[in-house]
UniProtKB/Swiss-Prot annotation:
Region (Disordered): 21-119
Any single Gene Ontology cellular-component annotation: extracellular region
Organism: Mycobacterium tuberculosis (strain ATCC 25618 / H37Rv)
Name assigned to this protein: L,D-transpeptidase 4
Enzyme Commission number(s): 2.3.2.-
InterPro entries membership: Big_10, LD-transpeptidase, LD_TPept_cat_dom, Transpep_catalytic_dom
Amino acid sequence: MPHWAEERHRRESNYVALEAGLDEGESIRRSEHSRSGCGADAGCWRCRGGPGRGSRRSRRSRGPGGTAGPVDPPAVDLLAPPPDPLALPPALDPLAPPPPDPLAPPPPDPLAVPVAAGPVAGQDPTSFVGPPPFRPPTFNPVDGAMVGVAKPIVINFAVPIADRAMAESAIHISSIPPVPGKFYWMSPTQVRWRPFEFWPANTAVNIDAAGTKSSFRTGDSLVATADDATHQMTITRNGVVQKTFPMSMGMVSGGHQTPNGTYYVLEKFATVVMDSSTYGVPVNSAQGYKLTVSDAVRIDNSGNFVHSAPWSVADQGKRNVTHGCINLSPANAKWFYDNFGSGDPVVVKNSVGTYNKNDGAQDWQI
């Protein structure tokens, strides 16, 4: 072969080798190997890349600079049987957890701040915007207070309100959780708001009265139910019975029955003087009295308390002997005094009549 033809053949062999993924040195060796008259023999040291060097496969597995190059595909077993299209899938492990649902909502963030779900009847979680239609009012409960679940919101104005609807629209009540409720007026200078049912335990309540703001919280749902049919007071905390006390309520003689209804704690005194003359009964009359009592918890503005009465312990749990108050033993009255606070409800049932006096504490009868 002429020299120029041999050189052309060598270059063409290099191009073919480079396109097949071989480096230039390997292509030169192939060219020399072909000129030497050797066939493509796997046992030839030339075909293996020369003495002391790796095979062609090992050299192809290295890229430029010694880095990993393309890897040959795995071998296929031509004798393996084809997959059975009718074969059943492997049985699921009944103890294995179900796979996650890609459409399921993400779990709640335990660190997220609770937000009211939206307005309900009587509530408005938005901030008041605009000129205030009244001077800054005062609130009860006071800002930051912890109260019972029967506590209403009391808003006192500096001057009488002529347009009550406008005033109500400027007062935004909201709570977490949201609960429906209503406004009601006690006087031209006082409006109140309460939920239709007791506040849930541990509720956060916010008030925005034309830009004057306040907030409070409820504690546990502590409820006393005085049942005149059994002469027992049952106390529940968050729906679970915690205490049952024998009691005595208002006697029939003289019309002193304790009326049915929902009361709530207004205030309490370690000791207080009770004087029948304060409601028109002379102290020296047959129904009169004047004595000092302990652990007295006021539940209305008509003279009714839950209090200690050591003189009526023998009657408690059996009969009614009081002038309207709820008598407890000294130990039970002390527990009641220590645990019940502002806004905790006292429900009287199976008695006579209904609590309907306009004494400023009849919120749950309105």
